[in-house]
Amino acid sequence: MDFDFRLLIVLLPILAAAGWAVFNIGVVAMQQFQKFLNK
């Protein structure tokens, strides 16, 4: 089975952007949650 590396080249930036967005949302959500707990 021959893997098409063009597919990887297309998907990699999309996956990187999605991962970065999820990471940032997670960080903000944790900060909000900690503020909520500290009230």
Curated annotation (Swiss-Prot):
Where does it primarily localize? membrane
Does the record bear Membrane in its keywords?
Answer: yes
Q: Where are the transmembrane segments?
A: 7-25
Keyword Glycoprotein in record: no
Domain of life, per lineage: Bacteria
Q: Where in the cell is it found?
A: Cellular thylakoid membrane
Signal peptide residues on this chain, from the entry's feature table = none
A Pfam match: PsbY
- Membrane topology recorded in Swiss-Prot or TrEMBL: Single-pass membrane protein
Q: Belongs to which family? A: Belongs to the PsbY family.
* Subunit relationships: PSII is composed of 1 copy each of membrane proteins PsbA, PsbB, PsbC, PsbD, PsbE, PsbF, PsbH, PsbI, PsbJ, PsbK, PsbL, PsbM, PsbT, PsbX, PsbY, PsbZ, Psb30/Ycf12, peripheral proteins PsbO, CyanoQ (PsbQ), PsbU, PsbV and a large number of cofactors. It forms dimeric complexes.
* Protein name (record): Photosystem II reaction center protein Y
> What organism, scientifically named, is this protein from?
Trichodesmium erythraeum (strain IMS101)
